[in-house]
Amino acid sequence: MNEQEPAPKRGRRFKEQTPVQRALGLLVRREHSRKELNRKLLARGIEPDAAQAAVDRLTGEGWQDDARFAAAVVRNRAGSGYGPLHIRAELGTHGLDSEAISAAMATFQGDWTENARDLIHRRFGEQGPIDLPQRRKAADWLARRGFDGNSIRAATRFDP
C-alpha cells in the first residue's frame, strides 16, 4: 500500500512592514501625537532614524497632525468629565508646546463651569451637595478631575 504523504503546509508569508506602514497602521486606529507615534515605533523595534523619517513623511502628507490630535483629546476628555487643568497636563505629556495646547483648548465650545455643574448633578442628584461635608467632597472630586477654583465654587454653590 502506498501511504500518501501529507501535503506541505502552505503558510502565508507576510512581508515585513516598512516603518511608514507600521505608523500608518497606528494612525488608522486613532490620532497620535508626533512624540507618541515616534515612541510606539521605537518600541516596535524600528530604528530611531527610520521612525523619525516615517513620522515626518506622514506629517508632511497630512496623515498625522498634532493640532487635530490635540483637538480630539480636548473634545474627548471634556466629554468624559475632565476639566481644563487635567486636559492641559495630559496634552503636555504628549509633547505639545504651550501654543499648541492653547490653540487646542480654544477649540472647546462649551462652558467649563456648566460641565462641572453637570458632573455634580450626576454625582449628587439635582439638589447637589447640601451640607458642608458634601460640598467639600464635591469640591475635592472636581479638583481631582482638573477643574479650576472658580468652576468648583460655582458648581458647589460656594458663590453667594
Swiss-Prot record:
Compartmental location: Cytoplasm
Disulfides per UniProt: none
Domain of life: Bacteria
GO BP: regulation of DNA repair
Main location: cytoplasm
InterPro entries (alphabetical): RecX_HTH_1st, RecX_HTH_2nd, RecX_HTH_3rd, Regulatory_RecX, WH-like_DNA-bd_sf
Pfam families, per database record: RecX_HTH1, RecX_HTH2, RecX_HTH3
UniProt keywords, alphabetically: Cytoplasm
GO cellular component: cytoplasm
Family: Belongs to the RecX family.
Role summary: Modulates RecA activity.
Protein name, as recorded: Regulatory protein RecX
Organism for this UniProt entry: Xanthomonas oryzae pv. oryzae (strain MAFF 311018)
